[in-house]
Swiss-Prot record:
Function noted in UniProt: Non-catalytic component of the exosome, which is a complex involved in RNA degradation. Contributes to the structuring of the Rrp41 active site.
GO terms under cellular component: cytoplasmic exosome (RNase complex)
Protein name: Exosome complex component Rrp42
Species, as recorded: Thermococcus onnurineus (strain NA1)
Residues annotated as signal peptide: none
tRNA-binding in keyword set: no
An example Gene Ontology molecular-function term: mRNA 3'-UTR AU-rich region binding
UniProt subunit comment: Component of the archaeal exosome complex. Forms a hexameric ring-like arrangement composed of 3 Rrp41-Rrp42 heterodimers. The hexameric ring associates with a trimer of Rrp4 and/or Csl4 subunits.
Family, as annotated: Belongs to the RNase PH family. Rrp42 subfamily.
GO BP field: rRNA catabolic process
Length: 272
């Protein structure tokens, strides 16, 4: 057994011993979220942006709005695309190069939560049906990784979208020209999907796992819900299995925590 495996085994035993007492390595209860900080409009040249600090995990999300062609099967809807960069300085496990499986999963979970909830009214992003629409780029940069990147990134994405403003455009049907005005309007955001992640460690379910807990967890489920209690995304990863009663408990916990997080997002957006 390598030194790293020995350390992981020791950490797992320590975490499991604490969990038997209803405690966690950082002093939280099983249902406690870490401290959450949100700041918006932190990138001057972006249409929208947000910085999120969840415990010691930090992410920066930027929104860029451009123009382009719609998807062929969705000619009357704008486009959303999500990218994630795992900055090597954020964690020793991150390496430079093309996106790895973690970055791809992270981007998909964030994208799906926003897209399936209908958070952005894509119909309102159409300039010329079938030809020209707004393209919204969501770029997530992980600055410091101490666990639960899924929630931090999803929270940052919706906060950045809610802060975003895009230049108004006028389309001249006769000339076919598009004029970009100096006036700005908010991105049409009508829902607030919030992801909440619950990890399973030794039969215990705990919300918002930190990095130590993620390294020894048996499984993980991320549930994204909107303010109406509708589920827009569920992502199970890292192996393991969840019983039906565990999934139902996770949904209830996700709804409760999402409501609390939503208030903090609204507070951050309203403070600007």
């Amino acid at each position: 057994m390598s030194e790293m495996e020995v350390m992981a085994s020791i950490m797992r035993d320590h975490i499991l011993a604490l969990l038997k007492e209803g405690k966690r390595v950082d002093g939280r209860s099983l249902e406690d979220y870490r401290d959450l900080e949100i700041k918006i409009n932190v990138i001057e040249k972006a249409e929208g942006s947000a910085w999120v600090k969840l415990g010691n995990t930090q992410v920066l999300v930027g929104i860029k709005v451009d123009m382009g062609e719609p998807f062929p099967d969705l000619p009357e809807k704008g486009v959303i695309t999500t990218n994630v960069e795992l900055v090597p300085l954020a964690s020793p496990s991150f390496e430079p190069g093309p996106p790895d499986e973690r970055a791809i999963e992270l981007a998909r979970v964030v994208d799906r939560g926003i897209r399936e909830s209908g958070a952005v009214e894509l119909e309102k992003l159409v300039i010329v049906p079938g030809k020209l629409v707004r393209v919204v780029f969501i770029d997530v940069h992980v600055l410091d990784h101490d666990g639960n990147l899924l929630d931090a990134s999803g929270i940052g994405a919706i906060a950045a979208l809610m802060s975003a403003k895009m230049p108004k455009v006028v389309y001249d049907e006769e000339s076919g020209e598009v004029q970009i005005l100096d006036e700005y309007e908010p991105l049409p955001v009508s829902k607030m999907p919030i992801p909440v992640t619950i990890a399973k460690v030794g039969g215990n379910l705990l919300v918002d796992p930190n990095l130590d807990e993620e390294l020894v967890m048996d499984g993980r489920i991320t549930i994204t819900t909107d303010e109406n209690g509708m589920i827009s995304s569920v992502q199970k990863s890292e192996g393991g299995s969840f019983k039906l009663e565990e999934v139902m408990y996770a949904i209830d916990l996700a709804l409760t925590k999402a409501a609390e997080i939503r208030e903090k997002v609204l507070e951050a957006v309203g403070a600007e």
